[in-house]
A protein has these predicted regions:
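Short, Lys/Arg-enriched, disordered terminal segments
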Residues: 1-11, 308, 316-318
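A conserved beta-strand-loop-helix scaffold within acyl/acetyltransferase catalytic domains
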Residues: 3-53, 57-68, 114-143, 149-254
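Short, high-confidence coil segments that cap the C-terminus of an alpha-helix
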Residues: 43-45, 104-107, 273-276
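Aromatic (often tryptophan-rich) hydrophobic motifs at membrane interfaces
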Residues: 49-51, 59-62, 81-99, 208, ...
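Short, flexible, mixed-charge acidic loops at enzyme active sites
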Residues: 68-73, 296
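A gly/proline- and charged-residue-enriched helix-loop-helix capping module
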Residues: 73-121
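Short, solvent-exposed loop/turn segments at the edges of secondary structure
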Residues: 73-77, 139, 308
Length: 318
């Protein structure tokens, strides 16, 4: 059995880390330091690199909060990232080494959130099996996605198709302009305030992502004929075939025009033309999957969307 050596991540390894993500099947934009570093001062980073014979075989993006190792609190998901052909015996040894590290550092539990099933397919099944005996709870959240490979005219519900055929004189476009993103952010704050919450990202963090991730993220804005922003979305390109809507919002004064239908339809066509397979519309569950927001879920299903699950393993240290 080859010995597994652990190295704690520092920014000296940034390029090495991101290069490794690029050659793994399970790694996505949310695994990269170029994404995770937008809020590195928010959390106590405890990301790890696992090596065999001085070569990286796996990485774990993670932070520590209240004696809990979380992978990852600053992204939609985390999980151990490794090459598809990693042998089971090495995976088991990594699990054992991680256990020992947690014990030595008084870490009492691990929370590992895996990517959506459309992103990871069955890639993490071996790892989930390795962790299953230590896992005391699995929470599941569901998201809806549009299958862009089968997208065609009239794909949506009868009501949504009717809305799109009406001449509301709405136009949608992508933007990374700071002033326009600021207007989108103000609309987003107004939307979330009605639900007594606020955006996960500050405006500064949103602009950091837009400025540093090039074409991997952008804002889509829908305007009426007078130039008012009536709806919008912030989108991340997670992989080469999956785009993810992180925020969706609309101006309630224009709700009769259902502007979000236009925004999502435009984005679906936009990413289909770029060769993407999926547009993920985000989770429709609340309280870590305990409840489903049926009105939100029903809205997304009218785009002829499908469900994709995100699992979180809550793991005991023993």
């Amino acid at each position: 059995m080859n010995e597994v050596i652990v190295t704690k991540y520092s920014d000296d390894f940034l390029t090495t880390w991101d290069d490794f993500v690029d050659v793994t099947y399970g790694g996505t934009l949310h695994s990269k330091r170029s994404f995770l570093n937008y809020h590195k001062d928010k959390f106590q980073d405890y990301s790890l690199m696992f090596k065999v014979k001085n070569k990286i075989v796996a990485i774990l993006p993670a932070v520590i909060v209240d004696k809990k190792l979380i992978s990852h609190l600053g992204a939609s998901y985390g999980g151990l990232i490794y090459k598809e052909n990693l042998k089971m015996e090495i995976l088991i040894e990594i699990k054992n080494v991680l256990n020992n590290i947690c014990k030595q550092n008084n870490i009492e539990s691990i929370e590992m959130r895996f990517p959506y099933s459309i992103v990871s397919k069955n890639y993490f099944d071996k790892l989930k099996y390795c962790l299953s005996k230590q896992t005391n709870k699995v929470t599941r959240e569901i998201s809806q996605y549009i299958d862009l490979t089968s997208l065609q005219y009239g794909s949506y519900s009868e009501n949504f198709n009717r809305i799109l055929n009406k001449d509301y004189k709405l136009t949608t476009r992508p933007t990374t302009n700071k002033e326009e993103v600021s207007k989108f952010y103000s609309l987003l704050e107004q939307n979330l305030l009605k639900h007594n919450t606020k955006p996960t990202h500050t405006f500064k963090e949103l602009m950091y992502l837009i400025d540093n991730l090039n074409d991997d993220c952008k804002v889509f804005l829908t305007n009426d004929e007078e130039g008012h922003i009536v709806s919008g979305s912030f989108v991340l390109q997670l992989t080469k075939n999956t785009a993810h809507t992180f925020y969706l919002c609309s101006d309630y004064r224009f709700i009769k025009k259902s502007p979000l239908v236009n925004t999502i339809d435009f984005m679906a066509k936009y990413y289909k033309n770029l060769g993407f397979d999926y547009l993920n519309l985000g989770i429709s569950t609340e309280n870590k999957g305990e409840n489903i927001n049926l009105s939100l879920n029903n809205f997304k299903e009218k785009f002829n969307s499908y469900g994709t699950v995100r699992e979180t393993f809550h793991i005991n240290i023993n």
